[in-house]
Amino acid sequence: MELAAWCRWGFLLALLPPGIAGTQVCTGTDMKLRLPASPETHLDMLRHLYQGCQVVQGNLELTYVPANASLSFLQDIQEVQGYMLIAHNQVKRVPLQRLRIVRGTQLFEDKYALAVLDNRDPQDNVAASTPGRTPEGLRELQLRSLTEILKGGVLIRGNPQLCYQDMVLWKDVFRKNNQLAPVDIDTNRSRACPPCAPACKDNHCWGESPEDCQILTGTICTSGCARCKGRLPTDCCHEQCAAGCTGPKHSDCLACLHFNHSGICELHCPALVTYNTDTFESMHNPEGRYTFGASCVTTCPYNYLSTEVGSCTLVCPPNNQEVTAEDGTQRCEKCSKPCARVCYGLGMEHLRGARAITSDNVQEFDGCKKIFGSLAFLPESFDGDPSSGIAPLRPEQLQVFETLEEITGYLYISAWPDSLRDLSVFQNLRIIRGRILHDGAYSLTLQGLGIHSLGLRSLRELGSGLALIHRNAHLCFVHTVPWDQLFRNPHQALLHSGNRPEEDLCVSSGLVCNSLCAHGHCWGPGPTQCVNCSHFLRGQECVEECRVWKGLPREYVSDKRCLPCHPECQPQNSSETCFGSEADQCAACAHYKDSSSCVARCPSGVKPDLSYMPIWKYPDEEGICQPCPINCTHSCVDLDERGCPAEQRASPVTFIIATVVGVLLFLILVVVVGILIKRRRQKIRKYTMRRLLQETELVEPLTPSGAMPNQAQMRILKETELRKVKVLGSGAFGTVYKGIWIPDGENVKIPVAIKVLRENTSPKANKEILDEAYVMAGVGSPYVSRLLGICLTSTVQLVTQLMPYGCLLDHVREHRGRLGSQDLLNWCVQIAKGMSYLEDVRLVHRDLAARNVLVKSPNHVKITDFGLARLLDIDETEYHADGGKVPIKWMALESILRRRFTHQSDVWSYGVTVWELMTFGAKPYDGIPAREIPDLLEKGERLPQPPICTIDVYMIMVKCWMIDSECRPRFRELVSEFSRMARDPQRFVVIQNEDLGPSSPMDSTFYRSLLEDDDMGDLVDAEEYLVPQQGFFSPDPTPGTGSTAHRRHRSSSTRSGGGELTLGLEPSEEGPPRSPLAPSEGAGSDVFDGDLAMGVTKGLQSLSPHDLSPLQRYSEDPTLPLPPETDGYVAPLACSPQPEYVNQSEVQPQPPLTPEGPLPPVRPAGATLERPKTLSPGKNGVVKDVFAFGGAVENPEYLVPREGTASPPHPSPAFSPAFDNLYYWDQNSSEQGPPPSNFEGTPTAENPEYLGLDVPV
């Protein structure tokens, strides 16, 4: 027989309890076209399996049935779970008139749910030539109720007598979603078939009679439903119905598509556990059901395992173990720790492909009590396999199965050693569960063996399947076993044939049951093979009586079993010796009695469990143990005549010796401790001296981050060096003054902006303004505002460079009629360069907008306002804000929704800033509340294209506003793009009536207000003072006026390659002007002035044509190629009233050259900014927003004063809305003062552009 026949799994193996829906369920078979193992009992096997069966949980295989066989036991079958095979039969008809559905969970040849093959007469040719003889073979299918095949096709071949197979409309039988439905029908027949009965309107039938007309339930449906009961639109069946219905409800189905729950078709069985939404608990569902095949059952059938997910299975899932309850039900339970090792048999785990038990795998079963799988012994087991090097299995190796008690699969034996006359190696086997069946039908198969008896004396259960015992010529005792007591359902039976006749040969040979076996039931000869004893059982042997009154050892009787008494029990002659097997259940003690137990001797110095105190007892005259008067605990050597410890009297010599020894040990211990202390002190002193001399140890272990050191310089100013001129603005945390910085010991005046905190400001505000100073001090770019210094008075004062033209937003609004395309694109280039520099030093700005860009000159802008800026550490790529008010309309979508700020979120803000410039200061999303911005952005809406922008410029804005931050351009790419556009500005920005002639100097209201102030003349620009240029100061024409004459000169420098250009705005009185191409020795300043410093002068002289020669380095035709050092910047066409401005090609400054005079220390080029060490991580590892301080004092540079406002030393807070900085609202309201009473702008709390991240948007 093939291996597949021995190792096939039986599909489902048990009978449902009769009370479950009244449906009888039976197992199927899995033999395919193989010959039956016992042709003599084959028909009986089919009858036992399918008698009264309605649902076949497996395959219905009808093969090799003779012509005269009665198959009436098939008439109740209504449903087949697997496939149906009718092959090699000689019967004319198969009575399956009630079969409605074939589910096809298993398929014949992996394709067919119905196969009808070679059902013919073996002598078909002889019958055809013999007059009057009708050939045998299948003539009609008569599957008149079959209306559904869920999966699989139809194969009909080799049936010469079969009719009507081509008259069936198979399309109607197949489910519409049956993707695997091949139809292979052979219509070659040797007889003429009559037509369908006239009652068959559609001429589709299964047989000749009117009852065999095919019932159509699919192709006749008019409304597109899967099944229906008629042709009307109202005749549709429920979607959970299969095979048709009698009405529209899911309780009117003839069969269920998925699961049958008490006669109602459902998609799923009710869950065992439900969720209570009121108590938020998982609760047991009293209506829960287990899934068993296509049915919902309250409990799993016997021999099946219930799982936690509500299914009935044959094998537990991984990390689960089988558990048997007291009532016999079995379930799978999850292991609390790694599951215990189990023994696997054939068909399981590593033995899944093994054919039989061999000498190569038999040792794996040593010591096993339960085998998960099956056992099969074939001729090759004992013959060996020389080709694969497997030796024959020796009889003594079979002793490993003597400990076996349970098999979950089947036991198949077709070969056995001749030296063994029985199967006594399985003498302790109690259960064969049969979850896996041989051929899908047999749990126990014994065939062709030379044994004389079975010897399975402990076998008490065959959980499922049939027992087949045949062709064992010497086997007796087959009929002496009560097989009915071993079976668990009525479909089980014993099939036997070809064994030794019991009535003559077995009896005559004395092979009968022992007289002590009850009812003549036994597994073999002798009193040890009885199924049950007629009298008593001692161990494994039946006896007539127990040794209660006589014999040794004495016994007591419990449930007709003879059990021995305890050895310390005294045998009694006229009464029972004991009442149990314990020492306290004796009638009398053989030696002594301690408490209630009989003992061989009384305890003498015995320590009880978990006790360190010994117990001493002695026996009295009656043999009862009594406690000794002295309970010795140690050195118990002297005992009295009773065995108790004698009283110990201490000797003086012993006391003296013990005292002397104790004193000596104490002295030795003192000496040792003293020596150890001295040596320890010497070692400490030695190690201290070595450390002081060498000092090679580090206090902390090195964890280099790879970051560059931040060598920025912080200038500390004295309050006496600062002179406040007028108030520029006030806010909740302080006041911004226009002032003059006069360094000690120098006759120099420098215009500055001074930010002073209020007197009652909290320490947090002082810390935050120092953090802002840290950020500003670390930047060194011509396009980023620079910090000049701080004054550490009682309230910290921040000193920054004064920008005379105010913020870029006000500038473009005021001069919108005079701005050209070149101005706008140059500003875009400079802002992009400034942001690219901030990205290089890992600084996230978070508040880039036109209002936060200051105008130093009409050709030079700088990024400012670092109140919200954040430095990223060396291992950080993004910043997460904790709260605070932020400019919603300038922010990227991920920053609004997830508080995530990166350099790419600054790119979004840059796009909005460019939009502001191109619309001359229009408000983004004007009229739309800030809270609606996230939804608007998620829906894909963006700012519209400005009228002056070409599609090239607008597409760059759109790229900046991509949802995916990685899809946005980098700042270095934006620099390249806008530099390219700046070379040909009118091609990309179209301004109507743009003046192509020389532009006039653009002044501003703010600029004029600064010039009108007193003491603002004869000032020196801050950057010129901090980084003097060689040749900048002209020689003093007269000694008396030399101290101030040079201050009227202004210059501009740009770094190109390694040199620096300077351009004097006024010719020297003593000689020709310095060549503008001459290198400056002051190059390399950390803060590099790359603009044309307009200065706050009282007048500017026009340049001579000779002085304009540096301007010719730029081509008047922007389409011509430019030198690389121009970096895409195009100078104005006519610059006589203005100084030249040249962009620098790289953001990071070059190393400084050695100046002629002393200079303040500067930070090396390329220094990396670091996060302040005082920052501590907050919740979830996110650094708290220590820069959340936001108010007017955050941005003093671009605050525009109101015209005509007086400047008292401490004026009342009457200021422009710009001074209050409407775009900010501080998080901590307790630290703010009351808002100004005469504030004329929009209150900060109502500003729509800024919204707190701590408020859900």
Curated annotation (Swiss-Prot):
SMART domains: FU (SM00261), TyrKc (SM00219)
Presence of keyword Membrane: yes
GO molecular function (one): DNA binding
Region (Disordered): 1029-1181, 1200-1257
Segments of skewed composition (Pro residues): 1149-1163
Residues in the Extracellular compartment per record: 23-654
GO terms of biological process kind: axon regeneration; cell population proliferation; cell surface receptor protein tyrosine kinase signaling pathway; cell surface receptor signaling pathway; cellular response to epidermal growth factor stimulus; cellular response to growth factor stimulus; cellular response to mechanical stimulus; epidermal growth factor receptor signaling pathway
Membrane spanning stretches: 655-677
Signal peptide interval: 1-22
Residues with the Phosphoserine modification: 1056, 1080, 1085, 1109
PTM notes: Autophosphorylated. Autophosphorylation occurs in trans, i.e. one subunit of the dimeric receptor phosphorylates tyrosine residues on the other subunit. Ligand-binding increases phosphorylation on tyrosine residues. Signaling via SEMA4C promotes phosphorylation at Tyr-1250. Dephosphorylated by PTPN12.
Class of enzymatic activity (EC top level): transferase
Cytoplasmic side: 678-1257
Domain Protein kinase, first and last residues per copy: 722-989
The UniProt record lists the keyword Nucleotide-binding: yes
Function field: Protein tyrosine kinase that is part of several cell surface receptor complexes, but that apparently needs a coreceptor for ligand binding. Essential component of a neuregulin-receptor complex, although neuregulins do not interact with it alone. GP30 is a potential ligand for this receptor. Regulates outgrowth and stabilization of peripheral microtubules (MTs). Upon ERBB2 activation, the MEMO1-RHOA-DIAPH1 signaling pathway elicits the phosphorylation and thus the inhibition of GSK3B at cell membrane. In the nucleus is involved in transcriptional regulation. Associates with the 5'-TCAAATTC-3' sequence in the PTGS2/COX-2 promoter and activates its transcription. Implicated in transcriptional activation of CDKN1A; the function involves STAT3 and SRC. Involved in the transcription of rRNA genes by RNA Pol I and enhances protein synthesis and cell growth.
UniProt protein name: Receptor tyrosine-protein kinase erbB-2
Source organism of the structure: Rattus norvegicus
Gene: Erbb2
